[in-house]
Amino acid sequence: MAEIKKKPVKIVETVLRDAHQSLIATRMTTEEMLPIVDKMDQVGYHAVECWGGATFDACLRFLKEDPWERLRKLRDGFKNTKLQMLFRGQNILGYNHYADDVVEYFVQKSIANGIDIIRIFDCLNDIRNLETAVKATKKEKGHAQIALCYTLGDAYTLDYWRDIAKRIEDMGADSLCIKDMAGLLTPYKATELVKALKEGTTLPIDLHTHYTSGVASMTYMKAVEAGCDIIDCAMSPLALGTSQPATEVMVETFRGTPYDTGYDQKLLGEIAAHFQPIREEALKTGLLNPKVLGVNIKTLQYQVPGGMLSNLVSQLKEAGQEDKYQQVLEEIPRVRKDFGEPPLVTPSSQIVGTQAVLNVLMGERYKMVPKESKKIMLGEFGQTVKPFNPEVQKKIIGDETPITCRPADLIAPQMPQFEKECAQWKQQDEDVLSYALFPNVAKEFFQYREAQQKKVDAAVADKENKAYPV
C-alpha cells in the first residue's frame, strides 16, 4: 500500500480568548496570561487567539485594563507565534454597525499593535458587511480570515456553503473558517461540509466549534480526515463544556497518523499546569459554573445555542411563566423562519429568542415587538439568507420602507466626531477607538486610569477649588 502523504493538522489555541470567554465570562487578566507566554510560544501553534470578541469590552468594563496594552504585552511575549483576533465585521467588537472609517482605523491599529490574523464574521452571513474589514486587513498586510456562522435550516444546503465559500475566495480572503458557535455540527455532517467547501474553494479551512452538545472532538476528527486544515482547541483546564475540545487530547488523537501535529505533550502539560489554578479559583468563587461543563443535548434537539437556552429560562423566570418553556422552544423555529432563517448568533439569537418569548406570553404573535425585531425587518442588520415572511414584516414595520443596500452605506464617517468627543481623555490614538465602541465604559476607564496615574480620586476631588481631602 502506498504511504499516505503527511498533512499535519494545524491548531489555533483559544485559551487566551474564547476558552475563558465561554467558561469564565472573559475574566482572565493580562497578569494571569503573561507568565506562560514564553512556553506557549514554543509549541508551534498555527496561531494563538488572544484578542477581540468580548475581551475588549471585558478589559475596560470589569478588569479595568487597557485592551490595547494587553495586546502590546502579548505581542512582546510571542516572538514566533501568530496572534489572532475575532472581529464582528461592520460591528467591529461592539453591537451596532459603524461607519467604514471606524472599521478601517480599527483594523489598522489592531495590526499595528500586533495582530497577524483577523477572523471576520457577520451574524447574518451577509458578506457585504465583511467587505470593508477584509479590504482594510489586506491593505495593512494582515491575514483576512472570513468566518461563516454555521447553522441548520432549509436555506443552508451544501450548495449554499459551496457557493458562499467561492464568493469569499473571490473577495480576497486568505482563509475560511466555519464558526459553529452552538456546537450543532455533528461528525458525519462535518465530513460532508468540509468536502463541499473543498469543492468550492482552494482556501485553507479552519473549523471552530464548541463542546456544548458533546460531539466536538469527534466532529474535529472527521473534519480533519475530510481535509480540514486547522482546528481551534483550548488547553485542558479551560476546555470542554461551552468551550472547545482540549488541545492535548486532539494532539494525542492524531499522534502517529498523517495528521500528527508533532507538538510536545510534556510542554503542553507544563502550560496546562499554569491554567489549572485559574480554573480551581474560578470554580471556588463561582465564576466557573459547573453547569456549563456538562453536555447540553437540548442544543442538538432544538438547534438552539446553549447560551440562548439559559437566557430563555431567565426571561421566563422573571415573568413567572416557567411553565411556558416548551411552547417557547417550539415558537423559536417559527420566528426564525419569519425572520429569514438567520444563524442564531449574537445579536440575532437574542432578537429571535426575545420575540418568541413575547409571542407566547402575549398569547398573540407579534402583538409586542422590540425595536431590534423592527431593525432586522427593516434590513438594518443586513440581508438574511431567505426572504422575510411578508405578512409578519408588514405587521412589524407597517408602511416604513426597508433598506436593501449594505447598512453601512447609509452611515456617514464617524471618526471626526469621536475624536472631538474623546479629546479630553486621549493619551494614545487607540483611546478614540475604545471610546467609539463603548463610550460610557471607556470614559469610566479613562477616569480610573487618570486617578491611578495622578493618584487622585476624581469622585472626591473638589475641582472648583482645586482641593483634595487629605
Where are the regions that the model predicts?
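C-terminal helical cap(s) of enzyme catalytic domains, especially alpha/beta-barrels
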Residues: 239-261
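Glycine-rich phosphate-binding active-site loops on the catalytic face of alpha/beta enzymes
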Residues: 120-123, 180, 226-243
